Amino acid sequence: QVIKILVVGCGNMGASHAQAYHELPDFEIVGLVSRGDSKRELNVRLNASYPLYEDYAEALADSKPDAVCIATYPDTHETYAVMAFDSGAHVFIEKPLADTVTGAERVIAAAERSGKKLVVGYILRHHPSWIKFIETGRQMGYPLVMRMNLNQQSQGYMWDVHRNLMKSLSPIVDCGVHYIDVMCQFTDARPVQVSAIGARLTNDIPEDNYNYGQLQIRFDDGSVGWYEAGWGPMMSETAFFVKDVIGPLGCVSIVANEASASGHSD
């Protein structure tokens, strides 16, 4: 059965998903939704003529999708996901599920109420390098020390993207959901303590947000981990890409020889 899918958000991730749906025979794109010109540019890139929508509610009602791919800014995730479930569609949504814990709980409740699938884009769970990294790290004994970061010296277009993201959330929330999920896969123990620090290094973001942060997490088997993320042209490129796990029996790391602090190296 071909799945009719509505793609909401036509930026980096939305365009990537649309490219896949365009090429996979099991999917039929029934619409592209965005607030700007990105949907038209995506149609050109795909050499397609998919229906284009400015308004998400109109797109849902008109296209009647089997599933919705939500790749918009995080402050819309909760509302868009609940609307999709209320329309009877399955949902694939980019991380984070919502920009608050209570928002995420409301999305989950809507999924359960509708009986439809809710899938969050935890890409690292399917990445061969990360699968091997976790498999090897679990052989290092316990407790583990898990050190991870991704600092991005973003400029120009990417700094615009990051500033827009920081209107609703911080770097450690946007990216950290990946790495806390990874830490939970390294150890089957229960997280028991979380703390964090942060700093606002620019006036270009809301006063109540920060563009540099580090969180620390402790598990009940004695394992500990930290994750650090910073965005902006002021960020240092020294030790900006750390993916490292240490246990009683040794250590394992991901070394990105060609990673760029201003690129997309998750």
Regions found by a protein language model. Name each.
Residues 1-47:
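N-terminal Rossmann-like dinucleotide-binding module
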Residues 17, 38, 50-110:
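Beta-loop-alpha module in the N-terminal Rossmann-like domain of NAD(P)-dependent dehydrogenases
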Residues 31, 67, 145:
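Short, Asp-centered acidic motifs that coordinate Mg2+ and/or phosphate
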Residues 54, 93, 118-120, 227, ...:
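Hydrophobic residues in well-ordered beta-strands that form the structural core
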Residues 106-123, 141-148:
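Rossmann-fold dehydrogenase core element
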Residues 124-206:
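Predominantly a Rossmann-like dinucleotide-binding segment in NAD(P)-dependent oxidoreductases
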Residues 180-259:
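Contiguous beta-strand/loop segments that form the cofactor/metal-binding neighborhood of enzyme cores
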